[in-house]
Amino acid sequence: MNAYELNMDGLVGQTHHYAGLSSGNIASTNNALSISNPQAAARQGLEKMRQLYNMGLKQGLLPPHQRPNLNLLYQLGFKGSPSEQINKAYKTAPELLSACYSASSMWTANAATVSASVDTEDNKVHFTAANLISNLHRHQEADFSKKLLEFIFSNSDYFNHHPLLPKSMGTSDEGAANHNRLCQSHAHSGINLFVYGKKVLGNHQFEQSPIKYPARQTKEASEAIARNHLLNPERVIFACQNPLAIDQGVFHNDVISVANEHVFLVHEEAFYNQAYVLDQLKEKADFPLVIIQISKEQISVSEAVDTYLFNSQLITLPDQKNMILIAPAECQANLKVKTCIDGLVADSQNPINSVYYLDLKQSMRNGGGPACLRLRVPLNDYELKAMHQGILIDNDLLDILDKWVLKYYRTELKISDLADPQLLYECLDALDELTQILKLGSIYPFQS
C-alpha cells in the first residue's frame, strides 16, 4: 500500500499584520508595527502549495480562522455591537485588539501533533490539537483547529481525535513544531522525537532553563501526547531543547532542526546534551539513519534564526530516493548559508541533491518559514481517501483561490486599519465564500 506525507498548509488570512505579539520570536518583534500586505502573503502561500503539488506531493490546506475574534473581545471586557467592541478595544487596549485580529493560524505546524497509523497501537492516525497557551493570540486557535481537524478527518475507522491537553502551564503544548518522525520511509514505522523546552513538575534540577525568552513546550505535554497516541515507548524519545538556543530566538524546535524519513538535519547546538540525544536516535533506528549535523562554525544559531535554514521543508519526491530542500529565499541571500546548502547538495553521502528557494517574505517577517506553514499528516491510500476531499489541492483549486484572494484581500494593512469595522465585514464575506469553495459547510461561528 502507498503511504504519503500530506502537507496541510495554512491559508493566510485577511488580517495578516505585524504586531510583535510573540516573545522570543525575533522576526516578529523586529518587524512590529510595520505595514503588511495580506494579499501578497496569501498569494506567496498559494504559490508554495502550487510548487509542491506540481512536484508530485500530496498537498492540502487549512482555512484561516474567523477574525477578529469577537468572543475573545467579549471575554476581555469589550461589549456591545461588533463595531463598538472594535472601537473600544482600539482606544483602550490596541495590543489586545491586535491579538484578536491575529492571522497566526497560518502557521499550521502549531495546529496539532499527528501520529502515523503505522506507529500507533490501534493502527489509526491520531490527532491532538495544540492548546498553545503560551500566547494569547495563539491560544484562541486551539478549539477551532480541533473542530477543523475533526471535520476534515471525521471517519472514526481511520482517525482518532484527542481532547486538548489541559490549558495549564504544566501542559503547555505547541504542536508538531516540536515533533519529528524518523523512519526508513513514510510507509514504515518510525521513531517519534518529541522536543520540550522545560519540565514543570517533579525533579528537573539537571536540566537548564532559558533566561531571556520563555520555553513553551513542556515535557509533561509531550509525554501525555505520546501516551494518548498509543505510541510504542521503545520508539519514542523526549529531548530537551538547548536553552541557549531558545535565548537566541529558537522558540520552536523546527527553527533549529528538520527531519524527513531517514534524514535528520540539525544544528550542533539544537539540544541540551545533544550527543546523548543523537546516540539514542542511532540506538533505536532499525534503518540507515543519516544525521547531518551543522556546526556553529558553518552557521551560527543566530544566522540559522535570521535565515530559517532549519525551517526549510525536506521532502522526498514520489518514486525517488533523493530529497529536495525547500528553503526560504533568505537562505539564498545569505552567502554563508547558501554555501552551506550548496555543500549539502554536492555531498553524495546524504540524499539531499537539490534545493528550491521560495519567496515567503510576508510570513518570514513574522517569524514563519516553509515548515511553519505546514502540518505534516502521514496517510496511506485508504486514509487519504477517507478524509474530506475539498481541501486537497490541485491547480484548478489554486486558480480559484488566487482569484478569491485578489477579490477580498487588501494590499496594505497598518495597525490603525484594525479600527476599521469594514475590515470585519470584508473578512466574514470572504470566509463565507471560502467555505463554499472548500465544501466545509457552516463551520465558522458567524455561520451558525
UniProtKB/Swiss-Prot annotation:
One function term, GO molecular function aspect: N-succinylarginine dihydrolase activity
Assigned keywords, A-Z: Arginine metabolism, Hydrolase
Ligand binding (substrate): 19-28, 110, 137-138, 216, 254, 366
Pfam assignment, any one: AstB
Keyword Transmembrane: no
Entry EC no(s): 3.5.3.23
Domain of life, per lineage: Bacteria
Active site: E174, H252, C372 (nucleophile)
Chemical reaction(s) catalysed: N(2)-succinyl-L-arginine + 2 H2O + 2 H(+) = N(2)-succinyl-L-ornithine + 2 NH4(+) + CO2
InterPro entries per record: AstB_sf, SuccinylArg_d-Hdrlase_AstB
Coiled-coil regions listed in the entry: none
Pathway: Amino-acid degradation; L-arginine degradation via AST pathway; L-glutamate and succinate from L-arginine: step 2/5
Claim: Membrane is one of the keywords in the record: no
Enzyme class: hydrolase
GO BP terms: arginine catabolic process to glutamate; arginine catabolic process to succinate
Assembly information from the UniProt record: Homodimer.
Family: Belongs to the succinylarginine dihydrolase family.
Function: Catalyzes the hydrolysis of N(2)-succinylarginine into N(2)-succinylornithine, ammonia and CO(2).
HAMAP family for the chain: AstB
Protein name (record): N-succinylarginine dihydrolase
Organism annotation: Legionella pneumophila (strain Paris)
Phylogenetic classification of the source organism: Bacteria, Pseudomonadati, Pseudomonadota, Gammaproteobacteria, Legionellales
